[in-house]
Amino acid sequence: MIARLAGRIAEKRDDHAIVDVGGVGYLVHVSQLSLASLPPPGEPAALRVYTHVREDALDLYGFATEDEEAVFRALIDVKGVGPRAAQNILSGIEARELAQAVAQGDVARLTKVQGIGKKTAERLVVELKDKLVALARAAGPARAGAEADVLDQLRTALLNLGYRPPQAEGVAEALRDSAEGRPLDELLREALKRLRG
């Protein structure tokens, strides 16, 4: 099984990236959030990988963060949620936010995500509440202070520039660790560089 890929980004598409590892291009399905956090083609990158083996195919699903991979693995354990559906869900909501919504039983928040109806949201809460509690605790209460403000401003700026919500959320999440103490214009320049890559 393939658990990690490190190489150069050869291509970025709507729902996948091609990672060139030693001259071999691996097609890796990724969420919009992970896709937005990947560097431009030609740049080095590493992805955590889930290998899905079917009778007629072998599919790779990639994740920019450990949290996203953990939530993906939990989602595919839920009856009726396969790898593609899990990836689509994670394109609409950040992994820790999903974990918090599940832990709080927030069905209304979950149903705002494309691909999650009321019955699926209720099933997620019932089946995943215990599995995602540690991740929800790690997410803690809402992000504090200036970091939250500048990331919210960054998302708003990207949306105003015409980027889709998953793209804005993905790049903001990718910049979270380096956001503290940085001005919005600097973060926006870095976000645009990543998105245009």
UniProtKB/Swiss-Prot annotation:
Domain III: annotated segments: 146-197
InterPro entries for the chain: DNA_helicase_Holl-junc_RuvA_I, Hlx-hairpin-Hlx_DNA-bd_motif, NA-bd_OB-fold, RuvA, RuvA_2-like, RuvA_C, RuvA_C_sf
Lyase listed as a keyword: no
Region (Flexible linker): 141-145
An example Gene Ontology CC term for this record: Holliday junction helicase complex
SMART domains (alphabetical): HhH1
Main subcellular localisation: cytoplasm
Subcellular locations according to the entry: Cytoplasm
Domain of life: Bacteria
Summary of subunit composition and partner proteins: Homotetramer. Forms an RuvA(8)-RuvB(12)-Holliday junction (HJ) complex. HJ DNA is sandwiched between 2 RuvA tetramers; dsDNA enters through RuvA and exits via RuvB. An RuvB hexamer assembles on each DNA strand where it exits the tetramer. Each RuvB hexamer is contacted by two RuvA subunits (via domain III) on 2 adjacent RuvB subunits; this complex drives branch migration. In the full resolvosome a probable DNA-RuvA(4)-RuvB(12)-RuvC(2) complex forms which resolves the HJ.
Function: The RuvA-RuvB-RuvC complex processes Holliday junction (HJ) DNA during genetic recombination and DNA repair, while the RuvA-RuvB complex plays an important role in the rescue of blocked DNA replication forks via replication fork reversal (RFR). RuvA specifically binds to HJ cruciform DNA, conferring on it an open structure. The RuvB hexamer acts as an ATP-dependent pump, pulling dsDNA into and through the RuvAB complex. HJ branch migration allows RuvC to scan DNA until it finds its consensus sequence, where it cleaves and resolves the cruciform DNA.
Comment on protein domains: Has three domains with a flexible linker between the domains II and III and assumes an 'L' shape. Domain III is highly mobile and contacts RuvB.
Similarity remark: Belongs to the RuvA family.
Protein name listed in UniProt: Holliday junction branch migration complex subunit RuvA
Origin species: Anaeromyxobacter dehalogenans (strain 2CP-C)
